[in-house]
A protein has these predicted regions:
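Residues at the start of alpha-helices and the adjacent loop-to-helix junctions
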Residues: 3, 20-22, 47, 159
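N-terminal signal peptide c-region/cleavage motif recognized by signal peptidases
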Residues: 23-27
Length: 176
């Protein structure tokens, strides 16, 4: 991705916290979102905040394990033109991640690590890896996220990728 700040910098971490808060608020106040479209199992939306326009494609899991969990899991690809950020892949599993365990995305034989966990969200630090996972998401039908709660309990979120490419393209177009 294009970024003026390294993803692991303190300034980037502060921005991510602000983005998390802003995203939580905007989801709670859905009238602030502009829906760009629903594409099978994916949605594309945009929102304006004090730093400018943010666009993202997102989906919810089609299956979760353990089954009884009422988590607010989501998979996102975001675009923030004011910050020169494109193709930012992130997840939330609805709980604070255990930093001792890897957060992995698996699709077929391809594996990708979300190596920047922060509270309930996690990001991929490498723009090259983000490009690889997006390329895989455009071709594949499923993506499985495996992560661990603070207690050590493993969770699995299974995402359908049906509609991803169209949602991705709509979000990207809206923010370019």
């Amino acid at each position: 991705p294009s970024s003026t700040l390294p993803r692991s910098s303190a300034a980037s971490d502060v921005y991510k916290r602000q983005l998390l808060l802003m995203f939580s608020i905007t989801l709670a106040q859905s009238e602030d979102l502009t829906k760009l479209g629903t594409f099978k199992d994916w949605n594309a939306v945009s929102v304006f905040n004090e730093t400018g326009k943010i666009c993202f494609a997102y989906s919810v899991p089609v299956r979760q394990s353990p089954k009884a969990s009422n988590r607010e899991a989501r998979l996102f690809v975001s675009f923030r033109p004011e910050d020169k950020i494109t193709d930012e892949v992130s997840i939330t599993s609805g709980y604070d991640f255990n930093p001792q365990n890897a957060i992995l995305a698996t699709s077929g034989k391809s594996k990708f690590e979300f190596d920047l966990p922060q509270n309930k969200f996690a990001w991929i630090s490498s723009g090259k890896t983000e490009q690889k996972i997006i390329k895989r998401m455009k071709k594949a039908s499923r993506l499985m996220i495996t992560a661990y709660k603070q207690s050590g309990t493993q969770t699995t979120d299974d995402y359908s990728l049906m509609g991803f490419t169209k949602a991705y393209n709509a979000a990207k177009k809206s923010c370019t």
